[in-house]
Amino acid sequence: MKLTSREMEKLMIVVAADLARRRKERGLKLNYPEAVAMITYEVLEGARDGKTVAQLMQYGATILTKEDVMEGVAEMIPDIQIEATFPDGTKLVTVHDPIR
């Protein structure tokens, strides 16, 4: 199977987000890459499901709380910018203060 670099990046996000979800379910606190992957994955899937940019900007800030991540991780992520594919094209979704 041949994948473009963009497709490989999306696949890596899915794998990292799945690992993060499993660790969270086991009660483990997430580190920086896991937290970013989980939020990114949920926003990408929301775009695929037809949600708007505004909806995803709000939704992205509800996925994880400070209790879900290791100490200091929330402060390391002031915002996340995700290039998501919507039915009408690719758009940039910025989630401000994603972990509250």
From Swiss-Prot:
Stored PANTHER family: UREASE (PTHR33569:SF1)
EC main group: hydrolase
Pfam families: Urease_gamma
Superkingdom of the source species: Bacteria
Main location: cytoplasm
Organism taxonomic ancestry: Bacteria, Bacillati, Bacillota, Bacilli, Bacillales
InterPro entries recorded: Urease_gamma (IPR012010), Urease_gamma/gamma-beta_su (IPR002026), Urease_gamma_sf (IPR036463), Urease_subunit (IPR050069)
Keyword Cytoplasm: yes
Residue ranges of the TM segments: none
Protein name: Urease subunit gamma
Key words, A-Z: Cytoplasm, Hydrolase
Summary of subunit composition and partner proteins: Heterotrimer of UreA (gamma), UreB (beta) and UreC (alpha) subunits. Three heterotrimers associate to form the active enzyme.
